[in-house]
Amino acid sequence: MTSSNSNSSREVSLERKTGETDIKLSVNLDGSGAGKRDSGIGFLDHMLDLLAKHALIDLTVEAKGDLHVDDHHTAEDIGIALGTAVDRALGDRAGVRRYGHFTLPMDECLVTSAVDMGGRYAFEYNAPIAASKIGTFDSELVEHFWQSFAVNAKCNLHVLLHHGSNGHHISECVFKATARAIRMAVESDPRSDAIPSTKGVL
C-alpha cells in the first residue's frame, strides 16, 4: 500500500492494490464531508456518504473490485484503506481528544458507538441484523467493514445496538453513530497539544 501526506499531517492519500481490488482513497480529518465515493456498491457508497458527512471528514474513494464474485473483498479493503489513512493522518496522536462516543437514534433504532484512537486494536460489536441481505448487500459486511477499519486505524471500537429491527436503519444508525464518535475522537483538543496519555506515547 502506497500513501502520501499533504502539507497538513491530517490529510492522507493512498492506494491499495491487490489481486482482488484496486482502491484509491484520500481523507482529510479537518474536512466538511466533501468528496466522492465510488465503490461500485451502491449501498456501501450510501454508508460512506453518511460516514463522511457525520464525521466531518473529506473522503474520496475510487474502488474497483471483484464484484463478479461478491462484495466482500471490496468492502473489506475499503475498510482497511480507510483505517490506514486515518491512522496515518493522526500521526503520533498529539493534540487530539482521543476518545469519542455517541448514542444515535434513527426511527426504531438506537445505537451507541465508542472509540479510542489510542493506537491499539480492540473490537466489540453487537448490532445484529436479522436479514442476510440489505437489498443485494450482505448485511454481515457492515460489521466486517468496521472490524477492518478498527484493525488498521489501530483503535478500540465498541458498537452496541440497543434496539432496532430494520436492517437498513440499523446499518445507517451504526455508520452515523460511529462517524460521530470518530469526529469527537480525532478533533483537536483546544486545551492540550500533548499526546493524550500518561505514558507520553501512543
From Swiss-Prot:
It is found in: Cytoplasm. Gene3D superfamilies: Imidazole glycerol phosphate dehydratase, domain 1. InterPro entries: IGPD_sf, ImidazoleglycerolP_deHydtase, ImidazoleglycerP_deHydtase_CS, Ribosomal_Su5_D2-typ_SF. The keyword Amino-acid biosynthesis applies. One of its GO terms (biological process) is L-histidine biosynthetic process. Keywords: Amino-acid biosynthesis, Cytoplasm, Histidine biosynthesis, Lyase. The keyword Cytoplasm applies. It is an enzyme of class 4 (lyase). Its EC number is 4.2.1.19. Pathway: Amino-acid biosynthesis; L-histidine biosynthesis; L-histidine from 5-phospho-alpha-D-ribose 1-diphosphate: step 6/9. GO terms for molecular function: imidazoleglycerol-phosphate dehydratase activity. SUPFAM superfamilies: Ribosomal protein S5 domain 2-like (SSF54211). GO terms for cellular component: cytoplasm. It holds the Pfam family IGPD. It catalyses: D-erythro-1-(imidazol-4-yl)glycerol 3-phosphate = 3-(imidazol-4-yl)-2-oxopropyl phosphate + H2O. Belongs to the imidazoleglycerol-phosphate dehydratase family. This is Imidazoleglycerol-phosphate dehydratase. The gene is hisB.
